[in-house]
């Protein structure tokens, strides 16, 4: 059976949690393959219960699904334990959550360095969440990181943390004028935290591939979005990992030939958090409307999201770099009551029109959106369950976005609830 990748096709916050939740009851495994607690998924159950997840895969809310935090994720032990407790206190069974032995641990010195670096950068800061994600990935690439499996051996763990802090304390004390961290305290705190998750540590690569060979279906859940990818995003205003579909194989240990479908999540308009170029950003009453009606505040940071019209240049780019086979269009209901809905179909840069993503970031910063005005609709569409239930102008909007983005819009979200979804094509049934 297949492995299916679910990715954000914009700058994150597209509604990936809802998509995972919708598919979760029909898959056996849900895997988070990159990022850390710098991203959040909001899931609204049919009961009306609202869950905000930051590190744990959204499939934890579906009984019988095995959830995996993959080797590509960076794990803050304190956040993990707090999130587990929060779920368990609300009656959620977390017994089927596993953690890759090769995932990296995010430790106090990563958070400290992240925060002081942002302050030091001042107006040149990237706009990170301050959660330590970037510094943890830096250590991974520099080969001085701490892996989850290291907590199983006190001697190995102590040696690695002492070695890491030799450098980190130099940075904290001599560059940022902060107090040095005590390696012994870091080790003891981590070992105490590990008592709460050591039983979850597993060779998840082996388990996932064995499951696929047994005919089970695996859903690979990315965090953030395509335009935040460290390689393919709006660098340097990006995250420190690969949310794109290529990162799914690397961050889970599943070979790329196992992946049979890539589901891109697209919001019916566009948002982003933090600094960086955003050609369709709105600064008028329309931006205020999208922010207020769409509830555009970050799940993780609480920061207000920047809002703009749908950008088909971004959508086409996401289709290309991810190999997207299907789209899940979310928050179509937010656009109800607008007289017209502009869609960006290209950019104008220094007087010349281009229809694809600019090659350089300096060009993207200068890009002016070229809009196609589509007629809006006034009807409340939150109760629509079939495509034909939508007003004709809403259907036309979806079909035009599908044409511009270059892949089939298989699902449409018309509200936050799991049941507030129109399925035009069954993503799982359409695959081998």
Swiss-Prot record:
InterPro entries linked to this entry:
Adenylosuccin_syn_GTP-bd, Adenylosuccin_syn_Lys_AS, Adenylosuccinate_synth_dom1, Adenylosuccinate_synth_dom2, Adenylosuccinate_synth_dom3, Adenylosuccinate_synthetase, P-loop_NTPase
Sections of the chain in a coiled coil: none
Q: Where does the UniProt annotation locate this protein?
A: Cytoplasm
Q: Which GO terms describe its cellular component?
A: cytoplasm
UniProt EC number: 6.3.4.4
Q: Which residues make up the binding site for IMP?
A: 13-16, 38-41, 129, 143, 224, 239, 303
Task: Cite the Pfam families for this sequence.
Answer: Adenylsucc_synt
Q: Keywords in UniProt for this one?
A: Cytoplasm, GTP-binding, Ligase, Magnesium, Metal-binding, Nucleotide-binding, Purine biosynthesis
Enumerate the residues binding Mg(2+): 13, 40
Binding residues for substrate: 299-305
Q: What does the note under cofactor report?
A: Binds 1 Mg(2+) ion per subunit.
Q: Which GO terms describe its biological process?
A: 'de novo' AMP biosynthetic process; IMP metabolic process
Cofactor(s) needed for function: Mg(2+)
Please name the pathway: Purine metabolism; AMP biosynthesis via de novo pathway; AMP from IMP: step 1/2
Active-site residues annotated for this sequence: 13 (proton acceptor), 41 (proton donor)
The UniProt entry lists the main location of this chain as cytoplasm
In UniProt terms, what function does this protein have? Plays an important role in the de novo pathway of purine nucleotide biosynthesis. Catalyzes the first committed step in the biosynthesis of AMP from IMP.
Q: What binding partners and quaternary form does the record give?
A: Homodimer.
State the family it belongs to: Belongs to the adenylosuccinate synthetase family.
Report the protein name in the record: Adenylosuccinate synthetase
What is the species listed in this Swiss-Prot or TrEMBL entry?
Mycobacterium avium (strain 104)
Q: Which gene encodes it?
A: purA
